[in-house]
Structures are given as C-alpha cells and as structure tokens.
Regions:
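Phosphate/dinucleotide-binding and metal-coordinating scaffold of catalytic cores
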Residues: 1-228
C-alpha cells in the first residue's frame, strides 16, 4: 500500500511538471519568460537596410596585403564604419572558389573577412565580433545573397543579417559590397541566447574541400521580356 501511494505521488508531481512546462511553451511571454533572441546593438546600425552604409578600410601597406591575399592571412587595419573609427581590427581575404575567381578575372577586388576581436577579445562593433564583406563578383544582379538572406529571415530561419555598403580603401573607391553578419559567437548569441554550442561550416559547395562547383543551376540570367 505504501509503495502504491508513493507511485501516486510521483505520477501527480510528474503531471504537474508536464503542465507547467506546457504552459511555459505556450504562454511564455504572458508568464514573463524571455525568448532566446537577444538584441545585440549592431542590428539597427550597420544592418539597417534603409540606406547604403559606408566602410573605409585604413591600412598602411595595402598593396603588400593584396599580394598575399591568396594566403588568407590576417593583417591589422582600422575601419571607419558610417563615420565611427574602430582600430586594431583584423582583415583577410575570404572565400574558396570566389577567392581564386578574383585572380582569374584579373582584378584585386576580393571579398574580406573582418574580426573586430582578433587582437583584443573585448573589442566588438556594438556586439558584433565577425563581419564578412562580400564582393558579389559572381552575381551580375548583386542581389541574390541579399534576397536569400532576407527571405530566410522573413521565414523565421536563423539567418545572417546583411546590408549594402559602399567600400573604400584609404579613401579610394573599392565598389559596392554586401556586409554580412559572421556566423560566429555574436550570431549564436543573437539567435539562440548563448554563444556556446555546435556550429558547423562546409568547406565548399560540392563538399569536396575546395573544388570548383558549378553555379549554372542557381544563377539568375535574363532570358526574355516575355514571361511565357
């Protein structure tokens, strides 16, 4: 009889806990529970899509940096983002297929990866630790990445924030780029409330670790004015 009473108590406690958890999931905001999403600060600044932002990269030996871009080694620089200066940041060329494509096209308009916390872990851009600057050199529309990231966000997918930026280097015109939130610690904290967890990144589109992949099946190409 004693054992039966204990089982009844355990079942009752379990049922109550289940009910409380269900209420927390269904009525979390009403009960005062906060969602995992965290406001970081950079969302409403660099990733405000109502304007084209400005970024000026300041580096003494820019020509020397370009000569070693294929090595993807970080170099120290300063960034002036919408008039605000951030010193002691780190920058390198980024990409696999796109990196080799820049040389193949005969120019030096690389995509870049910026780490605000590379030399000092306490430094960020309003909470943002990593930033990608995509050259969009393989997209004649210069819109595919932007549209896909925005659609993913509208569908509730944890997608990187992005916005267009007018890039200059030591005051020299470097063209229109797409600034993309790095999928790193700040991205995890903004979307999941914590910067710790499992995070995976493929080496290349074809999964082969650097081989060239064809984009023929996904490219946007003008065919005709007649939609039929």
């Amino acid at each position: 009889m004693s054992t039966s009473k204990h089982i009844d108590v355990i079942c009752l406690v379990g049922a109550c806990l289940t009910l409380l958890l269900t209420m927390a999931f269904v009525c979390g905001e009403t009960l005062g529970l906060q969602a995992a999403d965290v406001e970081m600060g950079y969302e409403s600044r660099l990733f405000d899509t109502s304007q084209v932002h400005t970024i000026d990269i300041l580096m003494e030996d820019w020509d020397g940096f370009l000569e070693t871009c294929q090595d993807k080694e970080y170099a120290q620089c300063s960034l002036v983002i919408d008039g605000e200066t951030y010193g002691s940041a780190a920058i390198r060329a980024k990409g696999n297929n796109s990196l080799s494509s820049v040389s193949a096209y005969g120019n030096d308009r690389y995509s870049f990866k910026v780490e605000f916390d590379h030399y000092d872990s306490s430094k960020t851009y309003y909470g943002l630790d990593k930033l990608n600057l995509n050259n969009l050199i393989q997209d004649n529309t210069m819109m595919k990445d932007y549209l896909v990231y925005r659609m993913m966000g509208d569908f509730g997918v944890a997608a990187p924030l992005c916005s267009y930026v007018y890039l200059t280097v030591n005051g020299e015109d470097w063209g229109l780029y797409l600034a993309v939130e790095g999928v790193e610690e700040a991205f995890l904290r903004r979307n999941y409330g914590s910067s710790y967890g499992e995070l995976y990144k493929p080496d290349s589109m074809n999964g082969g670790g650097g081989g060239r992949a064809s984009n023929d099946d996904v490219k946007l190409q003008y065919l005709d004015d007649d939609p039929d």
